[in-house]
Amino acid sequence: MSAIIDVIAREILDSRGNPTVEADVLLESGVIGRAAVPSGASTGSREAIELRDGDKSRYLGKGVLKAVEHVNTEICEAIIGLDVEDQAFIDQTMIELDGTENKSRLGANALLAVSMACARAAAEQAGLPLYRYLGGAAPMQLPVPMMNIINGGAHANNNIDMQEFMVIPVGAPSFREALRYGAEVFHALKKLLDDAGMTTTVGDEGGFAPNLESHEAALKLIVQAIEKAGLQPGIDVAIGVDCASSEFYKDGLYHIDSENLKLTSAAFTDYLAAWCDKYPIISIEDGMAEGDWDGWKILTDRLGRRVQLVGDDLFVTNAKILKEGIEKDIANSILIKVNQIGTLSETFQAIEMAKQAGYTSVISHRSGETEDTTIADLAVATNARQIKTGSLSRSDRMAKYNQLLRIEEELGDTASYPGRDAFRQRG
C-alpha cells in the first residue's frame, strides 16, 4: 500500500493569465505527484462546475482560492491514509464528499487536480511512466494529432464564427512525421498570410487568427498551405473543423454573422455537407448546438457514414449523456476533456462506453492550458488514437506534443501510428 499523507493545492496561472488549481499529493514513501487543471473558453452548459471566487478585486473574479482551500482542507482530510493506487475509490470518495451532481460545491477544478495528482504519484511510486501505469502493458499506439492552425470564435478576436480549422496528418508513417507535417503546413500558412498582408498573430490555442472574407476562405488557405508544404490534401493531410455551434445558435437558428447567414438545422447541415464535398474534411466537431438534438440527428443521418461527427458541448465527457446519444444514434465520436467531468475515473468510463458503442474518442486540451502533459499520456494509455492539443506554437501546446515524441521514442519499434484508421468507427 502506498498511503497518501498530505495534499497541498495552490493557485497558479494558465496560458491565458487566468488562475487555475495545481495540486501536490505526497505519499509516505516521499514520492510527490503534481498536476494542474485546464480551463475552457467555450463551455458546454452541462459541464462539471469550475469553481471561481467571484471576487472582482482579484483576477476579475476568476480567482480559485476557494477551490484551493477545499483541496487543502476537506479533500485532504478525506483522502489522507487512502491507497494512492486505488484511483476509483479516491475519485468516488471525492465525488461523494462534494455531494452534488455537477461538483459545484467543492469545484471540479479542485477534484480534478487531486485526481490527476494521485495518478501521477501512483505512477511515480510504481516506477512507471504515466501512460504505462494507467494503461497497463497494452498501450503501443500514438494518437493522430488534430492541429488547430486557424482560430476563430471564442478563441480569437477576429471575424470567424467557427472556432477551429485543423490539419490532420492522416498519411504520416509515424507520430514524429505527423508532427513534422503539421509544423511545415503551419509555417507554409504563415508565409501565405504574410504574403497576403494578413495578420499572423495567434489565438488562444496557437493558431493564426486572421480576418477572412468567409469560412470557405479559411479552408482554401489550408489547402494551399498543405500544397505549399509539398504535401497532398486529403492524402497526406486532411482537414477537421470545430464549429462550436452552441456559440452562434440563437432562437432556433445558426447565426453566421461573418457571412450574414441565419440557417435552420437542415440548412446548416447542407452548408457543412457542401464543405465536405469540396474539401478533404474528415472530422466535424459540434456541428450542431448542444441543445439541438433534432439538428444533430439530421446531421448524423446526412454525414455520419462519411465524416467523424464529434460531440464536445453535446456530451461534455459525461457517460450518462453519451449513453443517451448512443441510444438516439447521435454523432459518432466523443471529445474527451478531463475537466468537463472532474475525475480520471469518470473520464475512463466515458472512453470505455464510447469504445463499446463503436464511437471514436478524441482526447482534448482546453483553450486555457498549463505545462501539465497528463492528456498526452492519457491518449496513449486509453488507445484513444486521436488528440487535440492546439497548433504548432505556444509552449503550453508544444508540451503535450513533445511528451508524445518522448513516449514514441520510449516505445521504440513497438510504437504504431494509426493514421486514417483512427477515424474509422469501431465495432
Swiss-Prot record:
GO cellular component entries: cell surface; extracellular region; phosphopyruvate hydratase complex
SMART domains given in the database record: Enolase_C, Enolase_N
Record's keyword terms, sorted: Cytoplasm, Glycolysis, Lyase, Magnesium, Metal-binding, Secreted
Cofactor entry: Mg(2+)
Location in or out of the cell: Cytoplasm; Secreted; Cell surface
Residue numbers annotated as active site: E205, K337
Bound cofactor: record note: Binds a second Mg(2+) ion via substrate during catalysis.
Substrates-to-products reaction catalysed: (2R)-2-phosphoglycerate = phosphoenolpyruvate + H2O
Single GO biological process annotation from the record: glycolytic process
Database matches in Pfam families: Enolase_C, Enolase_N
The protein's Enzyme Commission number: 4.2.1.11
A GO molecular function held by the record: magnesium ion binding
Pathway: Carbohydrate degradation; glycolysis; pyruvate from D-glyceraldehyde 3-phosphate: step 4/5
Family recorded in the similarity comment: Belongs to the enolase family.
Function as written in the Swiss-Prot or TrEMBL entry: Catalyzes the reversible conversion of 2-phosphoglycerate (2-PG) into phosphoenolpyruvate (PEP). It is essential for the degradation of carbohydrates via glycolysis.
This protein's name: Enolase
GN (gene name): eno
